[in-house]
Amino acid sequence: MGFTLLIDNYDSFTWNIYADLASVGGNPYVVRNDKITLKEIEGMFSDGELERIVISPGPGHPRTDSGVSRDVIAWGMGKLPILGVCMGLECIVDLLGGEIAYAGEIKHGKTSLVQHDSIGVFHNLPQFLSSTRYHSLSAQIQSLPSVLQVTSTTKESGVIMGVRHRTYTVEAVQYHPESCMSEGGRGLMANFIQMKGGKWGGENAWCGVPAEGEEEQPKAKTNGAPSLPTILNRIHAQRLLDVEQAEKVPATSPANVSTSLSLYASPPLINFRDRMVSTPHTAVMAEIKRASPSKGDIAPTASAPEQALKYALAGASVISVLTEPTWFKGSLLDMLAVRNAVDSLPNRPAILRKDFVLSKYMIDEARLYGADTVLLIVAMLEPQQLKELYDYSVSLGMEPLVEVNNPTELSLALEIGSKVIGVNNRNLHDFNVDMSTTSRVNAALNGRDVVLCALSGISSHEDVEKYVKEGVKGVLVGEALMRASDTKAFLRSLIGLPPLEVVPKSRPLVKICGIRSTDDAKLAISAGADLLGVILVPGTKRCISTSTAREISALVQSARSQSSSKPLEPSLSSPWFTTQSDLLSSRRKPLLVGVFQNQSLSDILSAVEEIGLDLVQLHGDEPQAWAKFIPVPVVKVFRVSPEGIVRGGEFRRPGLNQAILLDAGGVSGGGGEGKAFPWEHAKRLIQSGEVGSEGHMPLPVILAGGLTPENVGQAIEQAGEGVWCVDVSSGVEGEGGKVKEKVEAFVKAVRG
């Protein structure tokens, strides 16, 4: 009778294994990992004495602390049965090219329920074995070598507890079947010592593991998912726990979330499908992805709103925000920050909650935190649940993105009426990527009116071109964008768009402020002024009455009727102030601006209606948020001190006032007094750029303060590109009001 060689990796559990082997007739011979050579082992095998090998548990890492174990495994595969326990499993996985890393949990002397495939060493063993664990490392499913298959996992968290070689009689378990707290340990050892030779099949057919080339016996499946837990199942279990915990917190309870939605506390929606279809080029679904199960950390410190603005300004149609915290390091707060960051864009991207959505509560969460759509993964949902979640999402105004991985899942997606279907080239059960998946699913669509998207593995223009030729409308790109050194250039190159270029502006517009009569107005209009400002601040020297302002308004409207506008479609990639300045520049002119300072909102609204103002200028300490309630574009004044300090609010904040006016003003405020501030400060502020543009898009401003016909050209030159309008009042006045020659000279100096 031959013996079982038990390699001891200096672990006390070796003696338990020895006892189990002996009790089931395994005739164990134990030797420590540094007290025997591979040559000696080969000799035992040649002499017909060695029938099987067990690699024991042990401390440390398999590469540094397992002695001869790895060499023994490499030699013995295909010759005789091998069983690895704990460190033994790690040796096998590491030797074959897999990754051994942190398991996501530390278990020392703890038990877990283990579910298994009921074949091999698990033949005839009951399910959900209570099993003792002593480890913090484990095999990583995303890097598991293709020659190995998962045989068992923990029921609670999906950590790999067992692997098997697909061809050779090599088995391994991560837990300790030899422990007195583990169930089925001796049954497992009894199965192992019955195995013969080095390959499956033949005399090993009794245990159910198919020989190479044979088909595995079918197992019960749901929606194509294997009965054994995979990374997808593990995430599924964790997300259920996450949601359960969130629902228990009073502030995020289902009732509170529902109430918030009923109060319209959520941001307004845009139509996800329409946003995709209306994109004039291939729609990019740009993903914010800090990490993933398959790649680990990608960009763990990335700012979600910053990344979102890069994507939006480069032309992304959708921003996909991963909100799963454990494997992808995302959060709902990321999504809300992204939604707020892009809110001021003229044609903002749709926001997708990319997560493993399992309940109506998660859809409510998505809506409350700013999503326009959610991802529904067919592989994670039973057909009835898929239908219920799809219908519920649509009832909230959110057409879901339904993810499929094969024609069978496509059929389920079509049955529920999906209008936007994404094909994941990555199988979520094993995280392998097959770039032909999208093509196969597209062929199965048979020309149906569905927006088809490719969802993974896309990193080049060639990848995109291939799918576009097959009818794909949108592509989701995550890792490649997150790793790109120039995000905007890379995104545009993916879909064949030229690099973004800042279009040089024409000469600035001219605003003549302090118009006090129709004569002043005629003079300014005749000289070619674009905007006329009337002061409506009681107690100031240039303040005019409402009746005079109405007369000036009528004159301005008459002159405007004879001018032409420049039709302008806001660029999909233009930020707030650039868009607003372009829109104002394209309008028929002249335009009438009413100037107010520290007056009530009701007074301002009354004046807009009574006078017929085209714009409002807030020249005092009014809240910027008032711009939301004023029915015409708002110019907000910000004071620049001699030291370059800006006062008056958040001058770069988008989404409120349509224009920024920089005027002189010291610590106490001031401004509007014909005093200049150093123009290099204006240049610095302009070059700080629109929010999210990283300085590549100058901040458009109206330049005011101490301008005259003699210095305005120098001011524009020193302040640089970004001055889209210049504002003058006292610089073109004489004792009796506006001076024709000065006004004409000023306009000429600006226009060149």
From Swiss-Prot:
Claim: Amino-acid biosynthesis is one of the keywords in the record: yes
SUPFAM superfamilies assigned: Class I glutamine amidotransferase-like, Ribulose-phoshate binding barrel
Pathway(s) annotated for this protein in UniProt: Amino-acid biosynthesis; L-tryptophan biosynthesis; L-tryptophan from chorismate: step 1/5; Amino-acid biosynthesis; L-tryptophan biosynthesis; L-tryptophan from chorismate: step 3/5; Amino-acid biosynthesis; L-tryptophan biosynthesis; L-tryptophan from chorismate: step 4/5
Binding site residues for L-glutamine: G58, P59, G60, S136, L137
EC number of the protein: 4.1.3.27, 4.1.1.48, 5.3.1.24
Gene Ontology biological process terms in this record: L-tryptophan biosynthetic process
UniProt GO MF annotations: anthranilate synthase activity; indole-3-glycerol-phosphate synthase activity; phosphoribosylanthranilate isomerase activity
Region (N-(5'-phosphoribosyl)anthranilate isomerase): 509-752
InterPro entries (alphabetical): Aldolase_TIM, Anthranilate_synth_II, Class_I_gatase-like, GATASE, Indole-3-glycerol_P_synth, Indole-3-glycerol_P_synth_dom, Indole-3-GlycerolPSynthase_CS, PRAI_dom
Domain Glutamine amidotransferase type-1: 3-202
Residues of the active site: C86, H176, E178
UniProt key word Iron: no
Keywords, sorted A to Z: Amino-acid biosynthesis, Aromatic amino acid biosynthesis, Decarboxylase, Glutamine amidotransferase, Isomerase, Lyase, Multifunctional enzyme, Tryptophan biosynthesis
Catalytically driven reaction(s): N-(5-phospho-beta-D-ribosyl)anthranilate = 1-(2-carboxyphenylamino)-1-deoxy-D-ribulose 5-phosphate; 1-(2-carboxyphenylamino)-1-deoxy-D-ribulose 5-phosphate + H(+) = (1S,2R)-1-C-(indol-3-yl)glycerol 3-phosphate + CO2 + H2O; chorismate + L-glutamine = anthranilate + pyruvate + L-glutamate + H(+)
Residue segments, region Indole-3-glycerol phosphate synthase: 231-495
Known function: Trifunctional enzyme bearing the Gln amidotransferase (GATase) domain of anthranilate synthase, indole-glycerolphosphate synthase, and phosphoribosylanthranilate isomerase activities.
Name the UniProt record assigns to this protein: Multifunctional tryptophan biosynthesis protein
Lineage of source species: Eukaryota, Fungi, Dikarya, Basidiomycota, Agaricomycotina
